[in-house]
Amino acid sequence: MNLYDVIKKPVITESSMGQLEAGKYVFEVDTRAHKLLIKQAVEAAFEGVKVANVNTINVKPKTKRVGRYVGRTNKVKKAIITLAADSKAIELFATADAE
């Protein structure tokens, strides 16, 4: 698996934006990726970033109905990335204070 295929997109929620002050960033990642691969991918994608810790969450698919048709949402894997104290911040998550 290529390192640039590991990170799919950032997760922008009220909870994830509240964790930015603590140096924690939330990304949706490939379901096959393990913690070491996620760490390498973040450090390769963002220059000057040092990862201290990686926590992962597997979100199960939910059953959804549209009329009489029943389907399921896709399963998702989220990664909570904690940056080291001497690391640069990830510029992808620009806050309103910076503008």
Swiss-Prot record:
This is Large ribosomal subunit protein uL23. One of its GO terms (biological process) is translation. It comes from the Bacteria. Keywords: Ribonucleoprotein, Ribosomal protein, RNA-binding, rRNA-binding. PANTHER family: 60S RIBOSOMAL PROTEIN L23A. The keyword RNA-binding applies. SUPFAM superfamilies: Ribosomal proteins S24e, L23 and L15e. Belongs to the universal ribosomal protein uL23 family. Part of the 50S ribosomal subunit. Contacts protein L29, and trigger factor when it is bound to the ribosome. InterPro entries: Nucleotide-bd_a/b_plait_sf, Ribosomal_uL23-like, Ribosomal_uL23/eL15/eS24_sf, Ribosomal_uL23_CS. The gene is rplW. The lineage of its organism: Bacteria, Bacillati, Bacillota, Bacilli, Lactobacillales. One of the early assembly proteins it binds 23S rRNA. One of the proteins that surrounds the polypeptide exit tunnel on the outside of the ribosome. Forms the main docking site for trigger factor binding to the ribosome. The keyword Lipid metabolism does not apply. It comes from Streptococcus suis (strain 05ZYH33). Signal peptide: none annotated. One of its GO terms (molecular function) is structural constituent of ribosome. GO terms for cellular component: ribonucleoprotein complex; ribosome.
